[in-house]
Amino acid sequence: MAVRPDQPPVPAFRADSSPERLADELLLALARPRLTQEVCARVRDVLGTHGAGLDWGRFVDLAGRHGVLPLVGRNLIRHRLAQSDEGRPLAPYRWIYSYAYEGNRRRNQALADEYAKVLRAVDDAGIAYAIRKGQPLVDTVYGDPGARRVGDLDLLLRRDTLARVADALTDLGYAQGRQSQNGERIEPFDRRTQLFWRTKLTNVALPFVKLSHRDDVELFIIDPCTSLFQVSSGVEADVGDFLDRRVRRTVYGEPSFVMDRTDQLIDACVQLHVEATTLYYIEIGKDLTLLKFLELAELLRAADEDVAEEFRRRVDVYDCAGSVAWALHHTALLYPDAVPAALADGFPVADAATLDEYGAFDGQVHRWESDFTTRLFDPARNKDVTARSNVPGPRAAV
Amino acid sequence: MREAPWPPEFEKLLRANLPLLDADAPLDPGLNLADHGLDSLATVGLLMDLEELLGVTIPDELLEQTSFQDPLAVWQLMASAAGDGAAPA
């Protein structure tokens, strides 16, 4: 596999872009773990020329929706892009960006303190686990505890250890339930939700939550997962394989375990496809999140030839090429430099018509009216979706 | 005719969730429930109704071990949940 440049190409802002489109392009340019001097110069130039007419409300809204507000905030502030060389403001309300980044860093520290306790407890109980997504990605992709908002702690586990996990978490004050309306209690999930999740969503368990009593953290959330693959996908994969391959890593200051790089890639591809095409996520507007494409791109950039080769092998073993093809195809639309042609060619999209379909995992296939790039930055893209998810309960991990 | 291993109330509740089973057709213990109209949402509703009927709460470990593919599997689940023997509340 050819060595890929460490630095993505400089974004090409179109001179005739509308204020809304300019906001979208700026978001793509700034939502990167690293900005080169060339990118900074280009952004500063564009903001100096067109910043006054840019739809900044849309920019902030989209940055929030796509989970990248702390990151773009950091980049705007750190590279002094919010003001010209003469000190003239180029982006209004600079404080929004600094607060988003600094506040996120404090918030992530609070999560780290709590989740470290959880990892210790799970480890002390002798339960085999691997952390998915979240903090391992923060460490690998960003190397900055403030750059990426973290929500829950996703743990990949064997199903037969769930009872022990429940005991360990209960001892720490967690319960499977939802926050009460006044935010002061955790109320158990209703029986229908419990039965549905336990009989139909056997790749996950209902989340365990705990009140944080902090304004910047609604809840501490632990998401147990016993398979990377949706039940409806038909993929049968022994979670033990993934746990056998887990690697040691210090996470939240604790000796812990994360999935190996290849499994992280598979997880990122599969999860991206699931979120983009499942009604559960579409309904809450979490189907297309720039953050997820960015992180897959970064994982791909960091993958060497050995990882790529093993990735191809495991995708074949787990028969998840369809999800991988979807994920690589769409990630390449946003980050063409991150997806090597040799890798993408190995996972061709079997039927291009499926690229704009959703609902397959729900057992009801529908088609989007607009294409991916149009939908990505359209906050109202789900307004014409009439199909409804039949999954009751929390709108968290599925 | 062989006596059903379950009480009439169980059969009545199960039949109510099998729209593709003729009313006068026997409820065979090995009948494929999905083929006779029991979908995933209806399964959840059925389990809730059976819990209420029999006055039991199915433990999680039993839920995870059960396939719900035929009447006998569902009955055995409820019987196990009830301990010595399930009976209408």
Regions inferred by a protein language model and the residue ranges of each:
Chain A
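Conserved NTP-donor binding/palm subdomain of two-metal-ion nucleotidyltransferases/polymerases, i.e.
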Residues: A2-G151, L157-V398
